[in-house]
């Protein structure tokens, strides 16, 4: 891509990819959306092998690394209050520039998910290879484009990237739409990941009822979706639940204003992608 000078700005929340966690289920009611996670140290824990987003009659398959980066791109937009259209544009761009991979190489000095060039004012090499920073810098420039939400995806992407191949982003629009719809929560229960066993040692829960890994999930989720996100270890499934051993969490998003459902699914899909 060509450079687009702008003063670098770092906006980062979250502390890295979650490990040792398994999505157990998602419950939707008229009151809350609850995402339940299991972090069971007594047996082998999962490692993602493949993820699939399905919306309508279209499905998109991505690797765990791609899913994690796509989820970060969507979560940064969520933090900034940007629409799903912005996420679609960003994902189409990342597909074209890097295949949604955090590359340590590129044309001239281009690096990272969006192949941003440090020499052109996008940030330091370390910054543009930070997915959270890179997504934020992309959105910094996207929101400066007048009417970007009404423009064709490829034109909006090109207005930011100034690529030598301005129409190439259109090739990825359909896949980007599917991922964006799932990761922004507009398409409920639309992201799943296949897993294979990976060993983790057992952990002891603390006085709050959390194991260290479960506490890490709670902190990570709140860093992205709000410090006031209610997270509980309350046991709701009788003897079948693992809440009483600190191995499961319930995450609640209130539904009063109608937004909780979408936000809840956005958080749930982020958790799936980052398991």
Map each language-model feature to its residues.
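A generic structural motif
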Residues: 120-122, 164-166, 255-259
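Non-catalytic cell-wall polysaccharide-engagement segments
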Residues: 1-54, 125-227
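Active-site-adjacent loops and short helices of periplasmic peptidoglycan-processing enzymes
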Residues: 41-161
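Generic preference for hydrophobic/aromatic residues in regular secondary structure cores
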Residues: 114, 191-193, 249
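Generic detector of intrinsically disordered, low-complexity, polar/charged segments
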Residues: 11-13, 17, 32, 109, ...
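Secreted/periplasmic proteins that engage bacterial cell-wall peptidoglycan
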Residues: 59-60, 65-111, 197-274
